[in-house]
């Protein structure tokens, strides 16, 4: 969300757990066609992958895309030791693509000092630094940073960072470095098909976590995306053929969500008509009978699924998962395999049994509810890892549309 706020472009996931190398190269080539620079952020440390390996790490991404990597280094409270850190990264995997460094949270008077040490010891350039700017620091909470929409004066913070970077980072050298990456072959993508069904997508402060690739893949299967807000709307949009309730922070808006009786009634009416509904994480919580907050107060919710949810103070089933359908469901036939990610502090008395879920370390359990026309659970699905899931969801929506247009009773 912050990437999109800064660039005014969709942000995509170059994640080796979700994508094979060819698919990742096609994704980057296709989405960067209209850009001068494709900037890829490593979410954790450069070599931090699955388990104790570098598998599916930022290092893997740089290898697959053949792109140079610039390490961001925080050298506070260090002297020459910063060179040991930099050299350690260079030596851990000898065939890495590390091409230089950026210094973070460094006083202007110390930047040259660190730059000289690093360049002398590693032989690689330091492209500049960013000082510590208290004015742009962002607050955090249990699921990470606040969302871009919640940050006051966000544009002013972005502007200040940009103005500072122009003064302290040699941006022209970074641009020249990026141009050393070999071109990626452009995939032949068909044009977007005409809309064949209307898909409602919850999008507000409570429901804001979606993979852009999921929405685009649904569009490529004919979806017209119709955005709405469970927080502020009094009813679902008209003439919908399906619903997608994504993740977010519903636990921060429990009084508003629970108190929007008109919208909840509209949602229940749609569910009674067997409208296809796919819900992830926060959307799954919203469909429960109730949610109990961290203080023990219970808020009634949509009541479309069996089970009640409780907010906790520790992560539940966090990380990458591979899911295998144990039955035919809204988005997957029995036996279908899709990759996903879980990141939540809530738990439910009824997590479901529609999918067998496996962590990379081999741990398995059952999860995800399939009730009537509703498929819902905690994992965030990545549709490109199983395009048939998006196709099946789209087909179910078109079947509903056909029944609706024929005036069938539900």
Set out the residue ranges of the language-model regions.
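ATP-dependent carboxylate-amine ligase catalytic core
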Residues: 1-65, 69, 73-97, 109-112
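Structural motif
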Residues: 39-41, 70-72, 102, 244-246, ...
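A short helix->loop->beta-strand "cap" motif at the edges of active sites that frequently abuts
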Residues: 67, 124, 272-276
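Phosphate-binding active sites in nucleotide-utilizing proteins
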Residues: 196-272
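Cysteine-nucleophile active-site neighborhood
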Residues: 250-329
């Amino acid at each position: 969300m912050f990437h999109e706020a800064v660039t005014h472009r969709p942000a995509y996931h170059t994640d080796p757990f979700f994508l094979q190398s060819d698919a990742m190269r096609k994704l980057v080539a296709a989405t960067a066609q209209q850009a001068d620079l494709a900037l890829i952020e490593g979410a954790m440390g450069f070599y931090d992958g699955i388990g104790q390996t570098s598998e599916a790490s930022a290092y893997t991404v740089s290898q697959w895309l053949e792109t140079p990597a610039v390490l961001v280094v925080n050298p506070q409270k260090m002297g020459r030791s910063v060179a040991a850190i930099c050299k350690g990264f260079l030596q851990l995997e000898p065939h890495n693509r590390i091409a230089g460094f950026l210094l973070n949270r460094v006083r202007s008077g110390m930047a040259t000092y660190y730059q000289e040490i690093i360049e002398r010891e590693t032989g690689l350039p330091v492209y500049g630094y960013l000082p510590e700017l208290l004015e742009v620091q962002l607050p955090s909470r249990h699921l990470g940073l606040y969302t871009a929409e919640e940050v006051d004066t966000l544009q002013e913070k972005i502007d200040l960072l940009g103005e500072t970077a122009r003064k302290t980072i040699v941006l022209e050298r970074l641009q020249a470095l990026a141009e050393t990456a070999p071109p990626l072959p452009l995939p032949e993508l068909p044009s977007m098909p005409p809309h064949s069904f209307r898909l409602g997508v919850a999008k507000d402060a409570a429901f804001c976590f979606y993979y852009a690739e999921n929405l685009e893949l649904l569009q490529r299967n004919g979806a017209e995306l119709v955005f709405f807000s469970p927080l502020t709307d009094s009813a679902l949009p008209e003439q919908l053929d399906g619903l997608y309730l994504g993740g977010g922070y519903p636990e921060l808006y429990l009084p508003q969500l629970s108190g929007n009786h008109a919208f909840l009634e509209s949602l229940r009416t749609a569910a009674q008509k067997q409208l296809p509904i796919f819900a992830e994480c926060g959307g799954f919580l919203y469909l429960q009978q109730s949610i109990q907050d961290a203080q023990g107060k219970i808020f009634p919710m949509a009541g479309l699924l069996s089970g009640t949810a409780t907010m906790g103070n520790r992560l539940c089933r966090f990380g990458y998962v591979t899911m295998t359908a144990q039955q035919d469901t809204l988005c997957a036939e029995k036996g279908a395999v899709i990759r996903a990610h879980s990141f939540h502090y809530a738990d439910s008395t009824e997590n479901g049994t529609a999918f067998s879920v496996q962590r990379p370390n081999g741990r398995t359990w059952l999860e995800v509810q399939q009730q009537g026309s509703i498929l819902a659970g905690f994992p965030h699905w990545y549709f490109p890892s199983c395009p048939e899931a998006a196709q099946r969801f789209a087909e179910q929506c078109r079947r509903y549309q056909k029944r609706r247009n024929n005036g069938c009773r539900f």
